[in-house]
A protein has these predicted regions:
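A short beta-strand element within beta-rich, extracytoplasmic domains
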Residues: 154-164
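Aromatic (Trp/Tyr/Phe) and Gly/Pro-enriched flexible surface segments
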Residues: 34-155, 186-198, 204-295
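Extracellular fibronectin type III
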Residues: 22-40
């Protein structure tokens, strides 16, 4: 069987090809066959330059995008500390920053883990930025998050830059798995960045670990990739470039949604992390055209 790989094709373009064969005496040419390359959808506000404040809450979106779409492609933990009962706390752990940037003249996303409290009631809050939407608070214990935004393209990796200062973990949630070996006051915090292409959205209740997404085994995951934990450490005040390869389970199933999650404290879902952890993200982009990695 003959196989060929074509590179450098233009996205969303129809091509025609014929197969040509010669046995030395005669030449054979097949009928023309056409195919259309997929759309290479860009990441919404991947450069992190657009920020809009709705009420007390900051979003990584332009005012025009937010108004036209009734919300932002990116959400964060901000609604949990600026809306409803969270409005008493009134802090935005995730905001735009125009000083600490990778590209001059733009902005970055600043994610600052902190202890959010009001009237003596509070929780450790890892700053986050994710493709999805904040759903609701779960009393004073946590929140429900809807992960995933509509997306049908198939990139091969996520590329970008981050800058991270890891504090020493000073809050350990009661439901933190013991096998993580985390010791308050001793274990350094780590950040996290991961991406998934899926065939559905997911609602996670961070007070109920049974709702957490199993990216390795869930049938709705088409492709997944994460920044290795060994790279999720302090960058010594420097910007660090990263590339996360998407590992595809199959090339026959097309995704319907994309999930990207970034957090200044990897175990923030368990209310575990450091109030000294600070992360910046900038110039995120989806890369297309490479040979896809199969799991």
């Amino acid at each position: 069987m003959f196989k060929a790989t074509l590179k450098g094709l233009t996205p969303n373009t129809t091509y025609s090809y014929r197969l040509k064969y010669s046995d030395g005496t005669e030449e054979y040419i097949s009928d023309a066959v056409s195919f259309t390359t997929e759309v290479a959808t860009a990441l919404v506000n991947g450069n992190m330059d657009d920020w809009y404040q709705s009420g007390k809450t900051w979003y990584a979106a332009s005012e025009g995008y937010f108004t036209e779409n009734g919300g932002s492609f990116w959400d964060s933990s901000n609604p949990g500390t600026t809306t409803g009962a969270g409005a008493l706390v009134n802090v935005n752990p995730t905001q735009g920053n125009s000083v600490t940037v990778h590209t001059a003249g733009g902005k970055s996303a600043e994610l600052k883990s902190q202890y959010a409290s009001a009237f003596g009631i509070g929780k450790f809050a890892a700053a986050s930025l994710y493709a999805g939407s904040f759903n609701s608070l779960v009393g004073t214990n946590g929140a429900k998050i809807d992960f995933g935004q509509p997306f049908t393209s198939r990139p091969t990796r996520l590329h970008g830059f981050f800058r991270y200062t890891a504090g020493t973990i000073d809050y350990v949630g009661s439901n933190t798995p013991s096998n993580l070996g985390i010791i308050s006051g001793s274990t350094p915090d780590v950040c996290s960045i991961y991406i998934a292409l899926t065939t559905r959205t997911y609602q996670v209740d961070n007070t109920d670990t049974s709702t957490f997404i199993d990216y390795e085994n869930d049938s709705g995951i088409v492709a997944y990739g994460e920044l290795p934990v060994s790279e999720c450490v302090s960058t010594d005040g420097l910007w660090k470039e990263f590339n996360i390869d998407l590992k595809y389970r199959t090339l026959t199933t097309k995704p319907t949604h994309i999930i990207i999650v970034c957090s200044s404290s990897k175990y923030g879902d368990y209310f575990t992390g450091s109030t000294g952890s600070l992360m910046y993200l900038d110039d995120l982009e989806l890369v297309y055209g490479d040979t896809p990695t199969l799991k």
